[in-house]
């Protein structure tokens, strides 16, 4: 680089100039020194010196740069060296692992190859494949931690130098390090700290509990106790268990008897709390408390040698507490002695031997059953749970004091039992017997929402209660927060205690009691029960003195439990007859003497809330026996049946010689269905307004398990239909097999929804709705819940599912008739159910009181997928709506559909006649029963008349859409079949989808006529198709006069009995399935008279296919199913005296498809001209062309073609056709129809030519059919009020009915129809003067 531009200085000269100069002068000689001095003086450096300085400076700079570069290179190569070393080490480790794998792999391969089956490798962990091999880890992974983790260890500081403290420790060297590195040291320290905290917490909790109880006494209206409160009451439990020990833990309904829930220490600390309780009078409470507190400690062992142990879930409240009232008195009306005894029993049940940790989880024993506050403990698997270490630190002095107090309570209880229970009417003071009704109602109202959040409890064990014993009353008396009241007649005929109408006993779950006659072997037998199964109690309560105690039996079924207890008045026919006196004297609760006869118990589990209260005021009609129809519904929860996967519930319905009835179980998913009860005697049922029709008085009633229907409803707001369709839980659980002649049923196995059974309620019974104020009569309850008095017989025959008829049981075999425990047994597991609505039940109830008597007989065989539907699954909204609706008693509501079970239809005509209720268009179902009078059946089992009442369509002037049929006929009937707007009667409500949304489609129908078609139906006018395709033949739902739909009285339909039509529906108040025979139409165009008894398993009729509720079957699926189901099994019923089928006539023009408006004008024409036309046309066969034969005959299936041969028409008079019967059903013939048919024949003869007609209709087929399709909405509206019945004129008949006038919408449609008729007439040249419509 050029150095000229820079000032280059002498590096050496930068030093001291003098020194440098002096040194230079000395070194260079005198001459040189002179020159240098001269140059310095001159200010100019010598050039040579400058060059030397520049060279030295550059060399120094280069050397400095090289030194920096070398230092940087050293750093780089050092890092590279480290990476190389690390990579080499890892490579060596990988090589080592590979060698280890190569050594271990052969053994693994050998172990795998030795396996014979390799499918289990998918389900079995790999470690189990070769469990015998050595478990070596890290074959594929390095055992070293990652570097970032190792760095954290390397960077951390060294462990504390605890070894420095060893010289101060007596343990020697390493003691300190070992002590502080031992985990047990920290565990011990933690336990000590926790124990201190727990002790403080217990003391604080106890004080808070006392304060809380005091405030709860001051607040008379409190709800269910919280789990924290209940756990706080478990500080002192007992050390052992007895089977029948009962501990009453729940406070009273309105918080007035709190002493049951308080320990004795709490009583001592705050005796004023006891004085506030309504259980004692003031003096009795204080004196009793003082007597208890002034005693000395003693320990009283239990009679079986064990100290009592309060169960872990002693205070775990059930979902639905229930109060049982004796003879019309509520639980709050109890005398002081009764409640005092309950207090004593409660205080005696507590023992301070165990102190409970409040924070510990309280688990539930699988062998104990908790029904509200009654705890029945089994001795097996009894152990103390959740005992914390501090439980052992209880003060011994306090334990002795509490035990001594409990002993005194036991003694005092015995004194009270002997003195007080025999004098129910004696009360210490007047105020103690006072019941604040307002407080009770308010407390029930406030605690109602808490029913949804109650804790899960255990069901009831299989124990029987011996009601006549005195100790029973003492043991079962308690009060429950938000319980309903169930009333039982007094049942103390043979006991030392006289009947006390004002005394009450609380049956929270009808638990077993310490009856004195229960011996120790019986208790030990219960204790030895190895199965922790949940059993349902059968409370055998022989009842007498019903005249003295006409108290109603009220059941208010709470959130999610429902038990049914029926109290029959006599023993079973199939069981050993036991007189009432002996039955009452017998120790019913012992397993050796179990009787299904005197009483029965039906546990049922609804899914949603249902309030069913039946009140029997006719108890005075039956002296010495249980009032008929008394039923007790005990609420029960579905999800608490059992802890086992298949919940097992046992109901003690067994024969007298059956000793294992307490362990009979039924596997169900929440269903227990056992109901054996006796119906009323014949005379009593007549007094109650029930039509018995010769039913034996001892005919039992049984209720089988059904699946409930989950109802979605908008509570009938604004008159709308339900917002969501019902969800049908159709389950196919096997039914029970009942041994013939044996009274112990093997209960059904089902996972379906529960049911509610009532056994013969009377008209005077009342129903109390939770949120309503209006009682409902029990006849409505019977229909609401599906009360079907009678016996559902069990049948061993295939495809036979029977329901008891008035005087016989169909399909019942081997003498099981009358066995109240005989259940319906069918190979098809299910019974046909029906769906109805509340308004229909209310309407039909009114007509039932008019004396309409009918019975239900099931000709339908068992269906695989048909479930009974229960009315117990109402939501809370539905209940409120039900209460409000029933208050108004308006029979016009059709908004809230519900399900009614059709199980046993007995002689209770007053109640059962209302089960045949009318259905809304979206509620129509197949009802598998025909309602008939047995003495009036004809040869085909058809009743001569069935009069029903209370039309569901009383507000409408037209039949529902399901009862109508619209036929769309193309103009060219030779090339295509007619189209019917059909509701698929073959599949009518055999699917849950049809129940949800009845759909209609345009169904292609054949034009092949049947049996002397002549002109028998309206189809003769529209297409000359088969004569029996009209809906007048299917069922007489279509009448020409729409005023029939406005009739609400059953007597108004007697005028139509002249037609002698068994299928006539009075006010159309019954579903179409109530007819015995269904005339079906399939795709072949043939009418099928289907009897329910002719249907097989594969038929679609009555089968409720369990698709999902949201899936609506399409048209193809329905029709395919209909063809497969009905064509092979529904042959056409042919009369032997009728001739073969005539060829079909040609399709008439559109001008003949006139409306009813024209009929009123042309009706007045002379009948003489029409008679002449009839005479001239009756001998001529209808016109038939090969073209029509070619297109219409192949439509019929092969099996129907054999039944529909083409033959010459019947040449006899048409009067014979009008009077003939189809399978015993006489066809209704309208005189106007006959006249129109005659005119129709005349018009057909006057046609110029068949080919011309065919050509015109062929050219206009598409256009007219499309037009009809576009107008179907108007036609549907018209057909709701009008019916097309074009028939042939009959000279022997006179016009007895006048057509109704059409409304404005119909007039508009008629004008369009007339325009079409005129257009067709102008083309065809035909005359329509001789045509009219009906």
Curated annotation (Swiss-Prot):
Q: Does the keyword Heme apply?
A: no
Which InterPro entries does this UniProt record tie to the protein?
Answer: SCAR/WAVE_fam, WH2_dom
Q: Does the keyword Hydrolase apply?
A: no
Biased-composition ranges, Low complexity, are 310-319, 945-956, 1289-1304
Provide the GO biological process annotations.
actin cytoskeleton organization; positive regulation of Arp2/3 complex-mediated actin nucleation
Keywords of the record: Actin-binding, Cytoplasm, Cytoskeleton
Residue ranges under compositional bias (Polar residues)? Answer: 241-256, 320-330, 791-823
Output one GO MF annotation: actin binding
Q: Where is the WH2 domain?
A: 1271-1289
GO CC, alphabetical = cytoplasm; cytoskeleton
Ranges of compositional bias, category Basic and acidic residues: 197-207, 574-595, 1248-1260
Task: State the signal peptide span.
Answer: none
Q: Family assignment?
A: Belongs to the SCAR/WAVE family.
* Summary of the function given for this chain in its UniProt record: Involved in regulation of actin and microtubule organization. Part of a WAVE complex that activates the Arp2/3 complex.
**The protein, known as:** SCAR-like protein 2
């Amino acid at each position: 680089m050029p150095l000229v531009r820079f000032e280059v200085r002498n590096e050496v000269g930068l030093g001291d100039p003098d020194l440098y100069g002096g040194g230079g002068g000395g070194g260079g000689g005198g001459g040189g020194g002179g020159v240098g001095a001269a140059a310095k003086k001159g200010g100019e450096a010598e050039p040579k010196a400058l060059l030397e300085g520049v060279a030295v400076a550059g060399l120094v700079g280069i050397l400095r740069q090289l030194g920096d570069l070398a230092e940087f290179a050293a750093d780089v190569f050092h890092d590279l060296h480290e990476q190389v070393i690390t990579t080499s080490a890892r490579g060596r480790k990988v090589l080592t692992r590979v060698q280890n794998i190569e050594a271990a792999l052969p053994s693994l391969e050998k172990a795998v190859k030795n396996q014979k089956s390799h499918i289990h490798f998918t389900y079995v962990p790999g470690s189990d494949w070769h469990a015998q091999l050595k478990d070596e880890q890290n074959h594929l992974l390095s055992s070293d931690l990652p570097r970032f983790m190792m760095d954290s260890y390397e960077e951390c500081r060294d462990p504390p130098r605890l070894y420095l403290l060893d010289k101060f420790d007596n343990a020697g060297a390493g003691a300190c390090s070992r002590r502080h590195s031992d985990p047990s040291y920290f565990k011990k320290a933690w336990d000590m700290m926790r124990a201190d905290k727990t002790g403080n917490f217990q003391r604080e909790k106890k004080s808070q509990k006392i304060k809380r109880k005091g405030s709860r006494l001051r607040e008379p209206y409190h709800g269910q106790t919280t789990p924290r409160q209940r756990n706080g009451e478990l500080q002192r439990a007992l050390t052992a268990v007895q089977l029948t020990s009962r501990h009453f833990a729940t406070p009273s309904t309105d918080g007035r008897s709190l002493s049951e829930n308080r320990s004795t220490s709490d009583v001592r600390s705050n005796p004023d709390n006891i004085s506030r309780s309504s259980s004692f009078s003031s003096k009795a409470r204080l004196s009793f408390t003082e007597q208890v507190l002034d005693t000395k400690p003693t320990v009283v062992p239990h009679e079986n040698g064990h100290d009592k142990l309060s169960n872990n879930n002693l205070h775990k409240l059930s979902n639905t507490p229930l109060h049982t009232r004796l003879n019309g008195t509520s639980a709050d009306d109890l005398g002081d002695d009764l409640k005092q005894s309950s207090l004593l029993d409660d205080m005696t049940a507590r023992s301070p031997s165990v102190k409970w940790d409040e924070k510990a989880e309280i688990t539930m024993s699988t062998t104990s059953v908790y029904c509200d506050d009654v705890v029945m403990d089994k001795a097996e698997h009894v152990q103390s749970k959740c005992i914390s270490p501090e439980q052992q630190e209880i003060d011994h002095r306090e334990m002795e004091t509490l035990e001594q107090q409990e002993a005194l309570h036991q003694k005092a209880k015995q004194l009270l039992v002997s003195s007080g229970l025999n004098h129910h009417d004696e009360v210490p003071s007047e105020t103690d017997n006072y019941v604040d009704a307002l407080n009770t109602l308010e407390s029930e109202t406030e605690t109602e929402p808490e029913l949804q959040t109650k804790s899960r409890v255990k069901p009831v064990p299989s124990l029987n209660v011996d009601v006549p014993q005195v100790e029973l009353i003492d043991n079962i008396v308690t009060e429950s927060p938000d319980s309903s009241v169930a009333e039982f007649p007094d049942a103390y005929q043979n006991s030392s205690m006289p009947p006390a109408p004002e005394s009450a006993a609380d049956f929270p779950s009808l638990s077993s009691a310490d009856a004195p006659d229960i011996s120790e072997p019986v208790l030990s037998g219960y204790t030895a029960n190895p199965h922790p199964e949940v059993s349902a109690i059968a409370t055998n309560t022989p009842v007498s003195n019903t005249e003295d105690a006409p108290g109603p039996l009220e059941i208010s079924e709470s959130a999610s439990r429902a038990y049914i207890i029926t109290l029959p008045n006599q023993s079973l026919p199939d069981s050993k007859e036991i007189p009432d006196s002996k039955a009452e004297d017998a120790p019913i609760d012992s397993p050796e003497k179990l009787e299904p006869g005197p009483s029965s118990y039906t546990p049922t589990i609804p899914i949603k809330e249902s309030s069913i209260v039946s009140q029997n005021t006719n108890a005075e009609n039956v002296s010495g026996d249980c009032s008929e129809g008394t039923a007790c519904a005990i609420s029960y929860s579905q999800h608490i049946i059992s802890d086992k996967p298949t919940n097992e519930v046992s109901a003690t319905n067994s024969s007298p010689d059956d000793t294992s009835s307490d362990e009979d179980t039924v596997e169900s998913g929440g269903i227990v269905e056992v109901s054996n009860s006796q119906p009323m005697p014949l005379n009593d049922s007549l007094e109650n307004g029930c039509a018995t029709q010769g039913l034996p008085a001892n005919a039992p009633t049984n209720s089988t398990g059904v699946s409930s229907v989950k109802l979605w409803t908008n509570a009938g707001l604004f008159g709308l239909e339900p917002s969501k369709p019902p969800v049908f839980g159709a389950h196919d659980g096997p039914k029970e097999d009942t041994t013939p002649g044996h009274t112990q049923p093997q209960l059904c196995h089902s996972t379906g929804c529960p049911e509610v059974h009532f056994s013969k309620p009377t008209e005077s019974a009342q129903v109390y709705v939770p949120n309503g104020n209006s009682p409902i009569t029990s006849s409505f309850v019977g229909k609401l819940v599906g009360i079907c008095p009678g016996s559902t017989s069990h049948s061993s025959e295939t495809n036979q599912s029977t329901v008891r008829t008035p005087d016989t049981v169909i399909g019942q075999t081997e003498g099981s008739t009358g066995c109240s425990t005989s259940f319906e047994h069918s190979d098809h597991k299910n019974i046909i159910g029906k769906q109805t609505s509340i308004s229909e039940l209310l309407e039909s109830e009114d007509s039932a009181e008019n004396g309409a008597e009918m019975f239900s007989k099931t000709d339908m065989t068992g269906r695989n997928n048909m479930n009974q539907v229960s009315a117990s699954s109402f939501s809370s909204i539905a209940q409120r709506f039900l209460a409000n609706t029933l208050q108004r008693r308006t029979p016009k509501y059709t908004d809230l559909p519900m399900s009614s079970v059709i199980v046993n239809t007995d002689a209770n005509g007053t109640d059962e006649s209302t089960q045949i209720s009318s259905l809304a268009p979206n509620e129509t179902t197949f009802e598998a029963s025909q309602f008939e009078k047995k003495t009036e059946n004809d040869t085909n089992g058809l009743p001569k008349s069935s009069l029903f009442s209370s039309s569901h369509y009383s507000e409408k002037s037209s039949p529902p859409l399901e009862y109508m049929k619209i036929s769309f006929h193309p103009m060219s009937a030779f090339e295509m079949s007619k189209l019917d707007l059909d509701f698929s009667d073959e599949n009518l409500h055999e699917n849950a989808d049809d129940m949800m949304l009845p759909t209609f489609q345009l169904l292609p129908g054949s034009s092949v006529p049947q049996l002397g078609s002549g002109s028998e139906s309206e189809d003769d006018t529209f297409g000359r198709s088969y004569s029996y395709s009209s809906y007048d033949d299917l069922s007489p739902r279509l009448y020409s006069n729409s005023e029939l739909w406005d009739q609400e009285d059953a007597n108004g339909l007697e005028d139509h009995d002249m037609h002698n039509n068994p299928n006539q529906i009075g006010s159309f108040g019954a579903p179409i399935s109530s007819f015995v025979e269904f005339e079906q139409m399939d795709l072949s165009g043939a009418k099928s008279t289907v009897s329910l008894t002719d249907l097989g398993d594969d038929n679609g009729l009555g089968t409720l296919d369990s698709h999902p509720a949201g899936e609506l079957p399409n048209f193809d699926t329905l029709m395919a199913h209909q063809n497969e189901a009905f064509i092979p099994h529904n042959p056409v019923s042919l009369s032997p005296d009728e001739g073969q089928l005539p060829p079909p006539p040609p399709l008439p023009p559109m001008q003949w498809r006139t409306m009813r408006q024209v009929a009123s004008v042309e009706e007045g024409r002379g009948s003489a001209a029409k008679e002449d036309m009839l005479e001239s046309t009756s001998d001529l066969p209808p016109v038939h062309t090969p073209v029509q034969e070619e297109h219409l005959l192949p439509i019929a299936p092969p099996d129907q073609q054999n039944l529909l041969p083409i033959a010459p028409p019947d040449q006899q008079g048409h009067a014979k056709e009008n009077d003939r019967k189809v399978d015993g059903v006489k066809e209704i013939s309208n005189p106007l129809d006959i006249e129109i048919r005659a005119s129709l024949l005349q018009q057909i003869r006057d046609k110029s030519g068949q080919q011309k007609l065919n050509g015109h209709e062929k050219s206009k087929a598409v256009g007219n059919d499309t037009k009809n399709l576009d107008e179907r909405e108007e036609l549907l509206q018209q057909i709701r009020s009008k019916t097309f019945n074009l028939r042939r004129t009959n000279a022997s008949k006179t016009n007895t009915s006048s057509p109704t006038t059409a409304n404005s919408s119909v007039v508009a449609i008629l004008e369009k129809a007339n325009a079409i008729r005129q257009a067709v007439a102008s083309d065809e040249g035909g005359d329509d003067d001789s045509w009219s419509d009906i």
